[in-house]
A protein has these predicted regions:
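Structural signal for interior beta-strand "rungs" in well-ordered beta-sheet cores
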Residues: 1-187
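Terminal amphipathic alpha-helical/low-complexity segments used for targeting or macromolecular assembly
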Residues: 1-5, 10-11, 16-17, 53, ...
């Protein structure tokens, strides 16, 4: 159902069974997949592609001009959202700044109310952003990561797959896959065993990641010594190899553990 008060440019492409609630505005370069629901007072502007069976909450603004001085009006940039993703009330997602690029949100994500995804971010599949989470420009959030409420993620930071960032944190370095982190700045606290278990990752794989975490964060070794040890002892395991590759690719550096707490105080969830 398209409410008569909605303003939809005739050049916009709406799939089958798309619904648009009152007073929403949809621009000419917008494409919406089958079965997607657009709430009231939503603004979709610029080049926006939304997949099938998504829900866009009241007051969300998607495709807005980025808050970045280097942006130039008229360049071909946009926002791309996958299938079955939920964008809740008053979320803002800004278009990219680099020509030919999109700010991206994957499939099966949940972006809770009033969260912000800035220009050129790349959010993977099955990601959860909790209320008031803020991603600044060029942030990467890999599959199945969770970012807690009121958490700010700094420019170019990366959050690895299955990572869990606690609420009210400040992220200014990369958070490796499978790691739970919290604080200002965020520091490593544990392995996200619960998230891994819920995703069906077997106990042997969880133990391998936990062993790598102990070497990296609980052994007292310097990173330059700990990482080669992880490679030598556990690098043959696919998930540990993923962890190693993420750390080696880091440009900002990865988070450390909280130096105010001894290794015995770092909580380790039962496998």
């Amino acid at each position: 159902m398209i409410h008569p008060s909605a303003v939809i440019d005739p050049r916009a492409e709406l799939g089958a069974n798309v619904s648009v609630a009152p007073y929403s505005v949809i621009g000419p370069d917008v494409r919406i997949g089958d079965g997607t629901e657009i709430g009231a007072h939503v603004v979709l502007e610029g080049r926006v592609a939304i997949g099938a069976r998504c829900r866009i909450g009241h007051g969300a603004v998607i495709g807005g001009v980025p808050q970045d001085f280097k942006y130039r009006e008229g360049i071909p940039v946009g926002v791309r959202i996958g299938d079955e993703t939920v964008i809740r009330e008053h979320v803002t997602i800004h278009r990219a700044t680099r020509e030919g690029m999109d700010t991206r949100v994957g499939d099966h994500c949940l972006v809770m109310a009033t969260s912000h995804i800035a220009h050129d971010c790349a959010v993977g599949n099955h990601v959860i952003l909790i209320n008031y989470a803020g991603l600044t420009g060029h942030v990467v959030v890999e599959d199945r990561a969770t970012v807690g409420g009121l958490t700010g993620v700094g420019p170019f930071a990366r959050i690895g797959a299955f990572a869990y960032v606690g609420g009210c944190s400040k992220v200014n370095k990369d958070i490796p896959p499978f790691v739970m982190a919290v604080g200002t700045p965020a520091t490593a606290r544990a392995v996200n065993v619960i998230g891994m278990r819920r995703a069906g990752i077997d106990a042997a794989s969880r133990r391998a990641v936990q062993s790598a975490f102990r070497i990296l964060y609980l052994s007292g070794l310097a990173p330059a010594t700990a990482l080669p040890r992880v490679k030598g002892e556990l690098g043959q395991h696919p998930l540990v190899a993923q962890l190693i590759a993420f750390i080696e690719a880091s440009k900002l550096g990865v988070i450390s553990r909280d130096r105010r707490r001894g290794p015995a105080e770092i909580e380790e969830t039962t496998l």
